[in-house]
């Protein structure tokens, strides 16, 4: 069958090349439909309960998609006429931000005070350059005593201040809207830094986080793919030392990548940081298929042998294992469809398409190119082959010792798996080459936190937020939160009510408390709302029928476990101290990312089990042996377990990306096992070799190819570990580690197990013979 296929392929090689090019260009034409997404929500499915809770919050109150400009005077003091004047100007200009809803700063803070029987509401700062020192001191005293400003808009020491721009994106063209806002804000910051060298401006906010996803994706495309091409060229070139083979491999890689990307465009997949790693992954998979065909071709091709015969022999040896490894690899990546995060589903589907395309090209285009391009037969046995023969002999001689050493290493490393803990801090998804990360770290250290938990706390009836009992509970909840470690700021409606109540009692400090009567509180609220200017109303804090208020808690950069523990304690407090209408979970992007790791682990567990069952069935069917198929699972499951153990020893934190590694690598590491076992069984069945000699035969025929392909895979994922996006980087590091350990297991654990298995079978046969 293979011989006939090979003969047809060799005969019609030019037609094969032509048809392949037609297919590739048809698939690649879908690239025009690809676009980058700039929305963090892409990581969450429509069914995600945390996202649904956040959407409900956003629909109840004004959306809080924001851009925060943090101004740092080099003098270390915000409270001077010059700096306050700059803040005034930035505040005014920030209103021109596309889609802006409101702008909050220390200068336009709606300061209230009593004047006779009237409530005066005005900007805290107007015309700062005209201020006398006494006026500056008054502004400083008010700002640093105001809970709604401190650790949100102004630092306690007064050394930095922020201008927060809230926007409402129409979401008609999200790909253009976010960059439009980002471009405006960055232009504004650059303009003021150039105009006033005495200040520095740092930028953060939800919109900058959204934009960072796009920047990380584009950065990976621009840097990692070229590096990977160079690595593959050098690796394959040095390993096979055949220019035409290297060129053919390179063409297969390029066609596999553009086909995968084009097919993704045809099915409507959006590019995100995880899917931006597709070219690197497809490249490593495609090169593995080609190397197996090429190395066996070169081993068979001698001056005395026909080129076509050598290629036919290589295809005969590799056709089945290359198909099986492609199938198992595709299954491993398709298991990522069980992920709770859509970008990882997209990644799995894109790489699976690339793997299948790479397989088809490696058994059509690649051998056709080998026949077309000039290839000189090797003059002598390669040093790599001689080394593998010697190494195979070493493994056979030392099989007992190697088996026990490997088993001890496995047990030792597996013991460290519990040292890992789940942690998803979304700011740390980006490394420090991304401006969003460095600016956000600076702002967290100096002013306020990017991490936030928001609550919608119901009063149980329309207008109920003026009820003193409700307000007292709300105030107690806010005070409880302010006492918790890691909390920077709590924005709560009661701060407004206490301030207005004090104003209405001649600004006497003793009256800085909640009004005693509901009617009085309602009147104060109405009076205050009527005095507020356009764009600075309370719709970001209270709902339309005044039956609920929003409380925002800003946090330091807490770990996932710390964050979930804090929210759990908050729920306990609400259930013990608050009326039932106030019971509700915290909602925010922070909470969404905090839960996603746990949700993904649970969903991927099922995907990994299904992948394992399917791959096991394929191996048993391929090897035609239930015992051999079951035995082969040991070197396939052990590497991931060892890798997570190593990760627990040296890193100790796993997150969203690492929860897909087991399913993903399962299909990859099976490749080496399938190739080794297929050659082992070929030696046993076709050549009648003993178990020890069959191991030697497997090392001599496939050992070098396994070494090169594993090296290519490891190199590919190590290149991906240079990604500026931490999810890609950590996933790549763990995957590279898993593949390295898989090679070790296939070279040092699988052969001793095979020989031990054969020895046990022989002893069993002898015992049965004696019994008869």
Write out the residue ranges for each language-model feature.
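Hydrophobic transmembrane alpha-helices and their membrane-interface caps
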Residues: 245-293, 628-677, 718, 745-748, ...
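Juxtamembrane segments of multi-pass membrane proteins
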Residues: 398-521
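Hydrophobic alpha-helical segments
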Residues: 260, 264-375
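Hydrophobic, glycine/alanine-rich multi-pass transmembrane helices and their short helix-loop junctions
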Residues: 235, 323-366, 370-373, 616-620, ...
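Interfacial segments of transmembrane alpha-helices in multi-pass membrane proteins
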Residues: 218-269, 339-342, 606-651, 722
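Pore- and gate-forming transmembrane helices of large, multi-pass membrane proteins
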Residues: 223, 285, 289-290, 302-339, ...
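Signature of alpha-helical transmembrane segments and their immediate interfacial
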Residues: 1-36, 367-368, 376, 380-426, ...
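Extracytoplasmic
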Residues: 55, 59, 85, 130-243, ...
């Amino acid at each position: 069958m293979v011989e006939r296929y090979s003969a047809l392929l060799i005969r019609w090689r030019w037609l094969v090349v032509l048809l392949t090019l037609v297919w590739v260009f048809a698939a690649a034409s879908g690239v025009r439909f690809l676009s980058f997404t700039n929305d963090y929500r892409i990581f969450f499915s429509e069914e995600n309960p945390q996202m649904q809770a956040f959407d409900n919050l956003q629909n109840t109150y004004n959306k809080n998609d924001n851009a925060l400009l943090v101004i740092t005077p080099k003098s270390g003091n915000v409270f001077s006429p010059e700096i306050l004047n700059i803040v005034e100007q930035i505040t005014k200009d920030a209103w021109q931000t596309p889609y802006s809803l409101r702008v909050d700063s220390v200068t336009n803070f709606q300061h209230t005070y009593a004047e006779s029987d009237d409530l005066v509401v005005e900007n805290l700062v107007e015309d700062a350059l005209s201020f006398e020192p006494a006026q500056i001191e008054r502004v400083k005293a008010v700002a640093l005593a105001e809970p709604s400003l401190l650790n949100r808009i102004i630092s306690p020491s007064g050394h930095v201040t922020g201008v927060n721009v809230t926007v409402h994106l129409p979401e008609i063209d999200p790909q253009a809207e976010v960059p439009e806002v980002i471009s405006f804000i960055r232009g504004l910051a650059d303009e003021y830094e150039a105009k006033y060298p005495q200040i520095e401006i740092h930028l953060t906010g939800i919109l900058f986080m959204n934009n960072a996803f796009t920047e990380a994706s584009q950065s990976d495309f621009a840097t990692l793919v070229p590096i990977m091409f160079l690595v593959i060229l050098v690796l394959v070139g040095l390993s096979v030392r055949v220019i035409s083979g290297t060129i053919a491999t390179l063409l297969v890689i390029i066609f596999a990548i553009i086909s995968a990307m084009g097919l993704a465009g045809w099915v409507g997949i959006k590019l995100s940081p995880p899917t931006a790693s597709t070219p690197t992954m497809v490249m490593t998979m495609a090169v593995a298929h080609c190397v197996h065909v090429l190395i066996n071709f070169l081993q068979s091709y001698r001056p005395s042998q026909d080129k076509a015969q050598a290629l036919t022999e290589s295809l005969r040896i590799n056709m089945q294992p290359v198909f099986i490894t492609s199938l198992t690899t595709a299954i491993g990546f398709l298991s990522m469809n069980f992920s709770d995060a859509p970008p990882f589903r997209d990644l799995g589907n894109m790489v699976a398409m690339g793997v299948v395309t790479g397989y088809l090209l490696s058994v059509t285009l690649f051998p056709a190119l080998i026949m077309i391009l000039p290839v000189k037969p090797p003059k002598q046995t390669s040093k790599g082959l001689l080394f593998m023969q010697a190494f195979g002999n070493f493994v056979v001689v030392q099989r007992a010792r190697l088996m026990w050493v490997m088993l001890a290493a496995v047990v030792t490393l597996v013991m460290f798996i519990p040292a890992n803990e789940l942690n998803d801090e979304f700011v740390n998804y980006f490394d420090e080459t991304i401006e969003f990360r460095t600016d956000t770290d600076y702002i967290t250290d100096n002013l306020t936190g990017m991490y936030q938990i928001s609550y919608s706390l119901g009063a149980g009836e329309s207008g109920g937020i003026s009820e003193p009992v409700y307000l007292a509970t709300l105030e107690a909840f806010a005070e409880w939160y302010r006492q918790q470690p890691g909390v920077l700021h709590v924005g709560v409606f009661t701060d407004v009510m206490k301030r207005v109540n004090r104003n209405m009692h001649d600004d006497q400090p003793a009256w800085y408390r909640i009004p005693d009567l509901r009617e009085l509180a309602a009147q104060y609220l109405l009076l205050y709302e009527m005095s507020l200017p356009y764009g600075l109303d309370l719709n970001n804090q209270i709902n339309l029928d005044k039956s609920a208020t929003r409380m925002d808690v800003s946090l330091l950069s807490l770990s996932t476990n710390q964050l979930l523990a804090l929210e759990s304690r908050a729920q306990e407090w609400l259930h013990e101290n608050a009326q039932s209408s106030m019971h509700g979970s915290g909602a925010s992007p922070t909470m969404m990312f905090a839960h996603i790791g746990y949700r993904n682990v649970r969903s991927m567990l099922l995907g990994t089990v299904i992948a394992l069952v399917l791959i096991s069935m394929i191996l048993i069917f391929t090897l035609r042996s239930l015992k051999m198929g079951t035995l082969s699972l040991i070197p396939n499951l052990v590497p991931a377990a060892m890798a997570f153990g190593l990760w627990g020893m040296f890193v100790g934190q796993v997150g969203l990306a690492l929860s897909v590694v087991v399913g993903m690598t399962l299909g990859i590491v099976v490749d080496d096992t399938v190739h080794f076992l297929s050659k082992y069984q070929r030696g046993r069945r076709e050549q009648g070799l003993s178990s020890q000699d069959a191991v030697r035969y497997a090392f001599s025929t496939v050992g070098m190819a396994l070494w090169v392909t594993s090296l290519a895979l490891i190199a590919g994922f190590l290149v991906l570990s240079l990604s500026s996006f931490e999810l890609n980087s950590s996933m790549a590091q763990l995957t590279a580690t898993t593949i390295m350990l898989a090679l070790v297991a296939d070279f040092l654990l699988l052969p001793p197990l095979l020989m031990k298995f054969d020895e046990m079978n022989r002893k069993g046969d002898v015992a049965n013979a004696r019994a008869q």
